[in-house]
Amino acid sequence: MQNSIIGFLKPRLVEIEQITATHTKVTLEPLERGFGHTLGNALRRILLSSMPGYAVTEVEIDGVLHEYSTKEGVQEDILEILLNLKELAVKVHGKDEVFMSLNKSGIGSVTASDIIHDGDVEIIKPDHLICHLTDENASIQMRIKVQRGRGYIPASSRIHMEDDLRPIGCLLVDACYSPINRISYNVEAARVEQRTDLDKLIIEMKTNGTIDPEEAIRRAATILSEQLEAFVDLRDVKEPEIKEEKPEFEPILLRPVDDLELTVRSANCLKAESIHYIGDLVQRTEVELLKTPNLGKKSLTEIKDILAARNLSLGMKLEKWPPSSILEE
């Protein structure tokens, strides 16, 4: 080893010890004295907070309108079922969002192996319990949405953000995207030739089985390196302006008129005039609607009130309507 007053040793990945399928020890050495704790603490925080993963974010259960209800023939209440789905370990290849379904009937346990999914989805623990059916005539059907993300996003922070697009009966789930369940590190003494004042860093992690430990360490180190690049060059570098692409139309305008929950009479009158989307409706004026057969002032008032509740009105001008997505349908 070449002795140098200012030179630094570069650590190497010495050993990956697979204790169980989800429990791993990773050893790196040699590190300069003190660097074991410096790097160990930084990597630990990044591994806990910044590893991307997949989590269940929304669930629709037939016959269930809210999470505080129960379902006949099911032992668990809806909140407990959502908690069980929250802990479901899912790995998806090549997609940021997927939908899965479940349809089970008869007495017995409902597990992750009962979930129907496509070939891009991998469920790590097929025996993961979801609920119990306690009656021969009992059944449960659900639609499960899985998304990619990082960190922890509680359902409460997404309620208002997704209200306009979320159908009735869609239950939000606290999204725990991190594939790292637990992580700790330990620093031991290491030796290289005559030097005995070096550090050995041992990182012990427990995952949900969706990430390779070596890949996790590599990602965490890359994130740390990218964050430290700003300190390498402290000159004032002007950040490039990022232009946010706004959607061509507000999402609510692309929703069908049926979502307004109008009376049957009003809804049928609009469909007869080929008014299928809310964007079609808001462009009509009061005079135009009153010319619609069988649509009177009472129906017009109903339509205006419902639009006003959504910050919309009749007589709006929408350029480039209808969008290409509707024309393709």
UniProtKB/Swiss-Prot annotation:
For this protein, the Enzyme Commission number is 2.7.7.6
Output one GO MF annotation.
DNA binding
- Which Gene3D superfamilies did the record assign? 5' to 3' exonuclease, C-terminal subdomain, DNA-directed RNA polymerase, insert domain, RNA polymerase, RBP11-like subunit
UniProt enzyme class: transferase
Recorded hits in SMART domains, A to Z, give:
RPOLD
Q: Where is this region: Alpha C-terminal domain (alpha-CTD)?
A: 249-329
Recorded catalytic activity of this chain's protein: RNA(n) + a ribonucleoside 5'-triphosphate = RNA(n+1) + diphosphate
Q: Which InterPro entries match?
A: DNA-dir_RNA_pol_insert, DNA-dir_RNA_pol_RpoA/D/Rpb3, DNA-dir_RpoA, RBP11-like, RNAP_asu_C, RNApol_insert_sf
Which CDD domains does the UniProt record give? RNAP_alpha_NTD
Q: Which GO terms describe its cellular component?
A: cytoplasm; DNA-directed RNA polymerase complex
Which segments carry the region annotation Alpha N-terminal domain (alpha-NTD)?
1-235
Alphabetically, which GO biological process terms does the record hold?
DNA-templated transcription
| Keywords, sorted A to Z | DNA-directed RNA polymerase, Nucleotidyltransferase, Transcription, Transferase
Question: Which Pfam family would be a valid example here?
Answer: RNA_pol_L
Domain topic, free-text comment: The N-terminal domain is essential for RNAP assembly and basal transcription, whereas the C-terminal domain is involved in interaction with transcriptional regulators and with upstream promoter elements.
Q: Briefly, what is this protein's role?
A: DNA-dependent RNA polymerase catalyzes the transcription of DNA into RNA using the four ribonucleoside triphosphates as substrates.
Tell me, how does this one assemble?
Homodimer. The RNAP catalytic core consists of 2 alpha, 1 beta, 1 beta' and 1 omega subunit. When a sigma factor is associated with the core the holoenzyme is formed, which can initiate transcription.
Q: Which family is this protein grouped under?
A: Belongs to the RNA polymerase alpha chain family.
- What name does this protein carry? DNA-directed RNA polymerase subunit alpha
